[in-house]
Regions:
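Aromatic-enriched alpha-helical interface/lid elements that frame and gate functional surfaces
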Residues: 234-310, 314
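A glycine-rich dinucleotide-binding beta-alpha-beta segment and adjacent secondary-structure elements
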Residues: 309-363
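Conserved Rossmann-fold dehydrogenase catalytic segment
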Residues: 129, 158-167, 189-205, 224-231, ...
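N-terminal helix-loop segment corresponding to the beta1-alpha1 unit
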Residues: 1-190, 368, 374-397
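Short, well-structured beta-strand/strand-turn elements
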Residues: 33-36, 308-322, 383-388
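Oxidoreductase and adenylate-handling cofactor-binding alpha/beta cores
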Residues: 174-194, 207-218, 260-267
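Flexible, small-/acidic-enriched active-site or ligand-binding loops
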Residues: 343-389
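Glycine-rich beta-alpha junction loops
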Residues: 40, 127-128, 201-206, 243-245, ...
Length: 397
């Protein structure tokens, strides 16, 4: 079934995580995404080994399913000419190079819009294309630190700084990039013109500080790390049980009472320290140990059953493999099986948005290096003889 943006052609001139995440989202929405890799080894994640499956990088296969692969040498003018010809017949270009890289190659936005005024260029960088840090390179770790995320992650100020375990700013920047592309496509339908979309890892980190920035803006003080707790409501955190850990979200008065009924401690509501959210936040250091003592009396599954019956939001702390095998994950098709020509069958994360009428096929495996080079070039009008000549000269692979 064609996806909601079927017919849109995307040239993904990006590698590793942020740019490929953007391309993956657009591919899962139905776009034709052509991943353009350098002829000298391809996307750097192809070398992120181990783990691998039959020599194919698991990291690369995760981020690049549902795409076609072309290996193109943009250091040679003939490679640039091929890229420009592709731009003529495409809708979107995604790139995550340092500022000025495309301009030096003669394929910056001003160059591209002369070739195709409708082209949309999505630039995902460390800090964006303007501002005092625009020329700096960026990585998720650095963006998490500079955006304030690492100052609110972890257990306390006296512990070493801690980053979020997942590459949060990379993935979020990719999603923001895809959102920007979709908005630019809608605007193009109205105006007939493309435009430049500019986002960054730094900004992707900042948007995850909404609550903490609200606190800092109101008080003038920066909130710190709270472990698994919430900066504005309580109790809302992880607790140890008889055999494991669970999370409990008793973040409003109704759920607070549901929790007290479930653990048979309604008496706590009579304690002025815990009567409302404001009181509970002020006295969380006293409240948490009381709740912890009660929750150690039963196993996680026992508590989850009780809390579910009360309608109290709760859940286990799953490992990644436990999440993969959770029946809800499987029912929602968030872990899918894809097929790679060399690696064979492997697991991938599925599309997190479902549509009633336009769900696209998401189960096409990532391309092997240069797998679709001939097919793609023929699609753009090149003959078999021309392609052979380009391959012999190292223009394509």
């Amino acid at each position: 079934m064609p996806g909601p943006i079927a017919g849109v052609r995307v040239l993904e001139l990006a590698q590793i995580m942020a740019g490929p995440a953007c391309g993956l989202m657009l591919a899962d929405l139905g776009a034709e995404v052509i991943k353009i890799e350098k002829t000298a080894g391809g996307d750097d994640t192809r070398k992120f080994l181990p783990p691998d499956i039959n020599g194919e990088s698991a990291a690369f296969m995760m981020m690049n399913r549902n795409k076609k692969g072309l290996a193109l040498n943009l250091k040679e003018q003939e490679g640039i000419n091929i890229f420009k010809k592709m731009v003529e017949q495409s809708d979107v270009v995604i790139e995550n190079f340092r500022k000025g890289t495309l301009e030096k190659l003669g394929i910056g936005y001003e160059d591209l819009k002369k070739i195709n005024p409708k082209i949309i260029l999505c630039e995902i960088s460390g800090y964006g294309r303007t501002g005092p840090y625009a020329d700096k390179g960026g990585f998720d770790l650095v963006a998490q630190g500079m955006s304030g995320l690492m100052s609110i992650t972890g257990e306390s100020f006296d512990k070493p700084p801690m980053k979020v375990g997942a590459p949060l700013t990379d993935i979020t920047a990719g999603i923001l990039g895809a959102t920007g592309v979709l908005a630019a496509l809608i605007n193009r339908d109205k105006t007939g013109k493309g435009q430049r979309v500019d986002t960054s890892l730094y900004e992707a980190g900042i948007v995850h500080t909404y609550w903490q920035s609200a606190i800092a803006g109101a008080t003038g003080k920066s909130p710190g790390p709270l472990g698994s707790a919430h900066p504005l409501t309580a109790p809302y955190q992880a607790f140890k049980t008889k055999d494991n850990w669970i999370t409990i979200g008793a973040s409003n008065q109704n759920n607070w009472m549901n929790l007290l009924n479930a653990i048979e401690r309604v008496d706590l509501q009579e304690d002025d320290r815990f009567k409302d959210n404001n009181s509970r936040m002020k006295n969380l250091e006293a409240l948490a140990p009381i709740l912890q003592e009660e929750l150690l009396k039963k196993t996680s599954n026992e508590w989850i059953k009780i809390f579910d019956e009360k309608g109290l939001p709760c859940g286990p702390i799953n490992s990644i493999t436990e999440m993969h095998n959770d029946p809800h994950t499987l029912d929602r098709k968030m872990v899918i099986e894809v097929d790679n020509k060399k690696a064979g069958k492997s697991k991938a994360i599925g599309m997190p948005i479902k549509f009633s009428d336009t769900n696209a096929n998401t189960e096409i495996g990532a391309p092997n290096f240069g797998q679709h080079t001939d097919e793609i070039l023929m699609q753009f009008g090149y003959s078999a003889e021309q392609i052979k000549d380009y391959r012999d000269k190292g223009i394509v692979a």
